[in-house]
Structure formats: structure tokens, C-alpha cells
């Protein structure tokens, strides 16, 4: 019986990952003309950041509306200046469900050109467009309920059930994290390209960050796999 429930647990988790949303091809001339990044821009300048956002955000929001997977496509982009030594960007939701993308000032310092900043922004917007937060929460809840249920069914104590729930939730939330990153790279590539930036050049940011390798239940795929996804996506649209 426990084996049967375990198989059901695995099947439900496997079914919880949605495919990459189909993105309508946007003629680049209707989006933004190409930007030639000199690499000499002050990427920590809010003026530069506003210029990037002014190009990327409308494209991301248009793709968000076209894919129709999430209801709120009104993005808000912020820069966190309190973390100068942290290189990070992430997407979350405000209390009202509005998608929020936050850059650390450390990431802007680490970037070498506007293509890299635009690519990171497109990638983070893509997480929302693909509904990754909702999928991760669903997988976490499902993993917790089923693994906790397994322990309860086998006569485990309340403490053991709680521990199993936490473990199941942690595993469930990570099952498709690598796929989510690759999906975001693919959609983010299109956003970056249609905004007039060079996503291939932008993805070179991956060559300067630690490579997570191909760890089981790791949160990110190998950097080489991410760069390959960008290149293959661009081969379809060029």
C-alpha cells in the first residue's frame, strides 16, 4: 500500500509541471530597434536602469497577456540598494498579486553591459509569465500532504508527520526548479530579443557565476545547459 501511495505521489508531482507557454512571435520592428551596448554604460545608474526597463517591461507584459497563464501582468521593477555585495535578482508577488522583480545593486555592479541586465530582467519576468510561483507552491503543498500522509498512514507520531510534511514540501518545491529556470531562460530570451537587446551576449553573465552542476534536486541547471537553451531559442527566431 505504501508503495502504491508513493507511486501516486511521484505521478502527481510529475504531472504538476506545465509545459513552456507558447510565445507569439512579435515582429522586432514593432517592438524595439536593436540596442548597441558599448559596455561603458554605468549600469548602477538609475537612469540606465530606467532605460532598460522602458524597453523590456512592455515586451514582457505583452507576452504575459498573450500567453494568458496568469491574471496580473502589471510588473513592478525595483532595485535593492541595501545589498551592495549580493549578486541576485528574483521575482515575487506583492500582497495584491502584482508581480515584482527585484535586482540587487550588487548584480548591476557585476553586469558588464545592458544586454546582461536586460536578459536577467526578461528571465525574471518569464518566471511570472510561466506561473512558476503558483506551480512551485502547488508542488510543495502536494509533496507535503502526500509524504505527511504516508507517515500518518504508517502510524507515525504527530512530530514525525510534521517533519515528513516539511520534507515533502521541500522536495516538491524543487522537483521542477531546473525546468523552471530553463523555461524562464527560453521566454526571457524572446523578451530580451524583442526588446532590442542581444540575449546571446546577455547570457554570457552565466559564464561568470558559479556553475551549480547537475545536482539532484538542485535549484538551477548547469550553466552550459542554460546557454544552450538561449542559443537554440535564438536559432528559431533569427
Each model region followed by its residue ranges:
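Sec-dependent signal peptide recognition
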Residues: 2-8
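C-terminal motif of bacterial Sec signal peptides marking the signal peptidase cleavage site
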Residues: 13-16
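Post-HEXXH active-site segment of zinc metalloproteases
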Residues: 132-163
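Peri-catalytic and regulatory segments of divalent metal-dependent proteins
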Residues: 19-139, 195, 215-217, 237
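Long, well-structured alpha-helical subdomains associated
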Residues: 177, 195-238
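Metalloprotease/metallohydrolase-associated module, dominated by Zn2+-dependent proteases
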Residues: 155-202
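Solvent-exposed, polar/charged alpha-helical surfaces in well-ordered, non-transmembrane soluble domains
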Residues: 47-54, 58, 101, 105, ...
Amino acid at each position: 500500500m505504501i508503495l502504491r501511495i508513493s507511486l501516486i505521489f511521484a505521478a502527481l508531482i510529475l504531472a504538476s509541471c506545465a509545459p513552456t507557454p507558447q510565445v507569439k512571435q512579435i515582429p522586432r520592428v514593432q517592438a524595439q530597434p536593436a540596442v548597441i551596448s558599448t559596455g561603458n554604460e554605468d549600469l548602477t545608474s538609475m537612469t540606465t536602469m530606467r532605460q532598460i526597463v522602458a524597453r523590456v517591461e512592455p515586451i514582457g507584459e505583452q507576452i504575459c497577456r498573450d500567453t494568458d497563464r496568469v491574471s496580473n501582468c502589471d510588473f513592478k521593477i525595483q532595485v535593492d540598494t541595501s545589498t551592495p555585495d549580493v549578486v541576485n535578482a528574483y521575482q515575487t508577488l506583492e500582497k495584491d498579486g502584482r508581480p515584482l522583480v527585484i535586482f540587487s545593486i550588487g548584480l548591476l555592479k557585476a553586469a558588464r553591459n545592458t544586454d546582461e541586465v536586460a536578459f536577467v530582467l526578461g528571465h525574471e519576468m518569464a518566471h511570472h509569465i510561466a506561473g512558476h510561483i503558483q506551480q512551485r507552491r502547488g508542488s510543495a503543498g502536494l509533496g507535503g500532504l502526500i509524504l505527511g500522509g504516508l507517515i500518518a498512514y504508517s502510524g507515525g507520531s504527530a512530530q514525525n508527520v510534521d517533519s515528513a510534511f516539511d520534507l515533502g514540501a521541500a522536495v516538491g518545491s524543487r522537483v521542477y526548479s531546473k525546468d523552471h529556470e530553463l523555461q524562464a531562460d527560453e521566454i526571457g530570451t524572446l523578451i530580451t530579443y524583442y526588446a532590442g537587446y542581444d540575449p546571446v551576449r546577455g547570457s554570457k553573465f552565466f559564464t561568470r557565476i558559479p556553475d551549480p552542476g547537475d545536482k539532484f534536486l538542485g535549484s538551477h541547471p548547469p550553466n552550459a545547459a542554460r546557454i544552450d537553451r538561449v542559443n537554440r531559442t535564438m536559432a528559431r527566431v533569427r
